[in-house]
Curated annotation (Swiss-Prot):
EC assignment: 6.3.4.3
Molecular function GO terms recorded: ATP binding; formate-tetrahydrofolate ligase activity
Residues reported in the UniProt entry to bind ATP: T83, P84, M85, G86, E87, G88, K89, T90
The keyword Ligase is annotated on this UniProt entry: yes
GO biological process: tetrahydrofolate interconversion
Name of the protein in its database record: Formate--tetrahydrofolate ligase
Pathway where it operates: One-carbon metabolism; tetrahydrofolate interconversion
Catalytic activity: (6S)-5,6,7,8-tetrahydrofolate + formate + ATP = (6R)-10-formyltetrahydrofolate + ADP + phosphate
Keywords attached to this entry: ATP-binding, Ligase, Nucleotide-binding, One-carbon metabolism
Family stated for the protein in its record: Belongs to the formate--tetrahydrofolate ligase family.
Gene that produces this protein: fhs
Length: 580
């Protein structure tokens, strides 16, 4: 499951144009003209239509050099625990970037690219919305530049080469019950979560249990997004662990001779994609790891390129601060040698009411009908996210993403609570409805936060040489609010294996539900004293971290009874409806 199910929604019912109508009426600039001020020409760009391009490896190297002459102010956008409808994190990211440019600051935007699974599932297409969206929306949400297809092919090539070794070679004494590399598909399909393969007799391979995960959940996605260049990508691919021999020795991608062909398939996919916002701000849309399974941010290579084009980079981390932001700080910043200068925490009146009503599942009508008492009861969740972020030593600005049903009394209650009780900067944001005009106060607060920031104040939550359990327990108690951690027997065995393999000095990536600060999606607010249950651990050796599975997170979602796909169509002229 991915992030915000649908960012801010102002429908035609109240006279506001739909995202689709806004996108269709946008005055877009050809991508070659958009990028001309940075001396990026035909030799630097691979074009995918009139409004999308990939930057060549040489162009990225050039921009890395240019970045040394710029300020490199990094702004991370995250959020409180969202409702299933989403609170407008991407809208705020896009709107803030546009507004900084509106204020004559040179700003770039970097976000993740959508996965087809969620697009056709509960989310529908989205890359922002209203007057703070990234274009061309249809292309971005469908095949885009083919990155997800390349990743799917590369992932399944590894699986095929592993099974070929298993059935046609005695090179490895493979433990068929300890193969850790399933197949991948960029589509939500619950029937493929658990499969049995090799049932075609002697010529059909070795019978064994297998399964599928969503392409965005593949370790290859995390590897792509954490690689600095093609050479680094190849090295990371080579060390991915795909299974184990009966004596416990790991089998890597390099062991099955797949490093070269897999990297070959990803040669173009590692090149960052550049598009534009509705106001003409360049936007990198590249990579899409989930924040509840992997680290949840766009590619490092896109970030590094963006630093060469502007003094500000606005990027987002998936879900709430407990997931994407924590991993951005402890994994991405550590591996990418970056330090945020300010954090924008997106909150909304409806999310606060959602937590104040202690509601599961969400009932939007009941949320909208609730009063200020429910809003104030939900402050506990916002407070926890602010506290979480302050642990890293970075200035925090709360953005109250305003929806049409929000009253002045409600919005002011949130702003006053932030300013007076939490002592943090806060501003109302209407960038969905007004574009950059609706984000001026927020942008000014963020600029002030950047100017007051001191990189020396930044600190990781835990040292790299802490034990695996110490890292897990630090995140659980400091970020989630847990009182203790319980490890299953399998998890204990996995930890011992991680130690033996030498993975006890890498960051941990906790896989947890995004619906709650706890590992139970039903729990709202900010519970304390509860027990986090860790059921399994495995190494993402290529990415460079350990994944600890908690609760019941799925790597292959299923379509709902009424999927977004059912409302999509295309006419004889090729015009699409219902995508977003």
């Amino acid at each position: 499951m991915t992030d915000d199910s649908k960012d801010t929604d102002l429908s035609e019912d109240n006279g506001f144009p739909t995202d689709y109508e806004i996108a269709q009426n946008a005055d877009m600039t050809p991508i070659w003209d958009l990028l001309e001020p940075w001396d990026l020409g035909n030799d630097d760009l691979s074009y995918y239509g009139e409004y999308t391009a990939k930057l060549s490896h040489d162009a990225v190297d050039h921009l890395r050099e240019e970045a040394k002459t710029r300020e490199n102010n990094l702004i991370l956008v995250t959020g409180m625990t969202p409702t299933p409808m989403g609170e407008g994190k991407t809208v705020t990211t896009v709107g803030l970037g546009q507004t900084l440019n509106h204020l004559d600051e040179e700003a770039m935007i970097a976000i993740r690219e959508p996965s087809l699974g969620p697009v056709f599932g509960v989310k529908g297409g989205a890359a922002g919305g209203g007057y703070s969206q990234v274009l061309p929306m249809e292309e971005i949400n469908l095949h885009f530049t083919g990155d997800l297809h390349a990743l799917t092919s590369a992932h399944n090539l590894i699986a095929a080469m592993l099974d070929a070794k298993l059935s046609q070679s005695d090179e490895f004494d493979v433990d068929v019950n300890d193969i850790s590399w399933p197949r991948a598909l960029d589509m939500n399909d619950r029937a493929l979560r658990e499969t049995v393969i090799g049932l075609g007799g002697e010529s059909g391979g070795v019978p064994r249990e297998d399964g599928f995960l969503l392409t965005a959940a593949s370790e290859l996605m995390a590897v792509l997004c954490l690689s600095s260049d093609l050479e680094d990508l190849k090295m990371r691919v080579s060390r991915i662990i795909v299974g184990y021999e009966n004596d416990g020795e790991p089998i890597t991608v390099d062991d099955i001779d797949a490093t070269g062909p897999v990297t070959m398939l990803l040669r173009d996919a590692i090149e960052p994609n550049v598009v534009q916002t509705i106001e003409g701000t360049p936007a990198f849309v590249h990579g899409g790891p989930f924040a509840n399974i992997a680290h949840g941010t766009n590619s490092l290579i896109a970030d590094k390129a963006a630093f060469g084009m502007g003094d500000y980079l606005v990027t987002e981390a998936g879900f709430g601060s407990d997931l994407g932001a924590e991993k951005f700080m402890n994994i991405v910043c550590r591996l990418g040698d970056m330090t945020p200068d300010a954090i924008t925490l997106v909150a909304s009146v409806r999310a606060l009411k959602y937590h104040g009503l202690d509601m599961w599942p969400a009932d939007i009508d009941e949320i909208n009908g609730a009063g200020v008492d429910a809003l104030e009861a939900g402050f506990v969740n916002l407070d926890k996210h602010v506290t979480n972020l302050q642990k890293f030593g970075i200035p925090v600005v709360v953005a109250v993403n305003r929806f049409p049903n929000d009253t002045d009394v409600e919005v002011n209650a949130v702003l006053n609570h932030c300013r007076n009780d939490l002592n943090v900067k806060a501003a109302s944001s209407t960038v969905f409805a007004e574009g950059s005009e609706g984000g001026v106060e927020l942008a000014e607060r963020v600029i002030g936060a950047v100017e007051s920031s001191d990189p020396e104040d930044f600190e990781y939550l835990y040292p790299a040489d802490a034990t695996i359990k110490e890292k897990i327990e630090t995140v659980a108690t400091e970020i989630y609010g847990a009182g203790s951690v319980n490890y299953s027997t399998d998890a204990e065995d996995d930890i011992e294996r991680m130690r033996e393999l030498g993975f006890d000095t890498v960051p941990v990536c906790l896989s947890k539900t995004f619906h709650s600060l706890t590992d139970d999606a039903r729990q709202k607010g900010a519970p304390t004293g509860w027990t986090l249950n860790v059921r399994k651990l495995y190494p993402s050796a290529g990415a460079g971290f350990i994944v600890a599975l908690t609760g019941d997170v799925l790597t292959m979602p299923g379509l709902p009874a009424d999927p977004a796909a059912a409302d999509m169509d295309i006419d004889a002229d090729g015009d699409i409806t219902g995508l977003f």
